[in-house]
Swiss-Prot record:
Pfam families: Smr. Residues 88-169 form the Smr domain. It is an enzyme of class 3 (hydrolase). Transmembrane segments: none annotated. It comes from the Bacteria. PROSITE patterns: SMR. PANTHER family: DNA ENDONUCLEASE SMRA-RELATED. This is Probable DNA endonuclease SmrA. Gene3D superfamilies: 3.30.1370.110. NCBIfam families: endonuc_SmrA (NF033154). Its EC number is 3.1.-.-. Keywords: DNA-binding, Endonuclease, Hydrolase, Nuclease.
Length: 187
């Protein structure tokens, strides 16, 4: 600090007096301070519904096939002939958390170009158990995705009635590669 700066500082501090007892100062935190919430932009687009639900009885296996999909595809899916490329475990999760997880999982699977995934929703002992409510919501949510072609109850070694296989639509790139592969064979 040069001499001019020091004299300016002393002039500015001329009438300042030190606190006599600094221990008497207490800071009170302001009330209703909320931690900034991180907005999950992916969840802003979440279209999955959580309204009124028709509970699917445990005795009824989960099964859905989009119109236009060949019956053979569902048969192969049901018999576990398609390898599972990813799985999602929803066991003991609240319904709203399951909703977010299913949405993110399917979106990520589509972005990664996956075709077949497994969702483990659990199974309860009665129709109104939490696991069966989640199971019923999963069945509803999967039909709300245009890119879900089919789903069905998994085989026992993959979770049986506590899980389901999901077949996703091919991406445009996968369709193009498939077309090129088959076009080369026909020449």
């Amino acid at each position: 600090m040069n001499l001019d700066d020091k004299s300016l500082f002393l002039d500015a501090m001329e009438d300042v007096q030190p606190l006599k007892r600094a221990t008497d100062v207490h800071w009170h935190p302001t009330r209703n301070q909320r931690a900034p919430q991180r907005i999950d932009t992916l969840q802003l687009d979440n279209f999955l519904t959580t309204g009124f639900l028709d509970i699917i009885p445990l005795s009824q296996p989960l099964e859905f096939r989009r119109e236009g999909l060949q019956h053979g595809v569902l048969d192969k899916l049901r018999s576990g002939k398609y390898p599972q490329q990813a799985s999602l475990n929803l066991l003991r999760q609240p319904v709203e958390e399951c909703r977010k997880m299913v949405f993110s999982f399917i979106q990520q699977a589509l972005a990664d170009g996956l075709r077949n995934v497994l969702i483990i929703h659990g199974k309860g002992r009665d129709d109104k158990s939490h696991a069966n409510i989640v199971r019923s919501y999963v069945a509803r949510w999967l039909t709300e995705f245009d890119d879900v072609q089919a789903y069905c109850t998994a085989l026992p070694h993959h979770g049986g009635s506590g899980a389901c296989y999901v077949a996703l639509r091919k991406t445009a790139q996968a369709k193009q590669e498939n077309w090129e592969r088959h076009a080369k064979r026909s020449r």
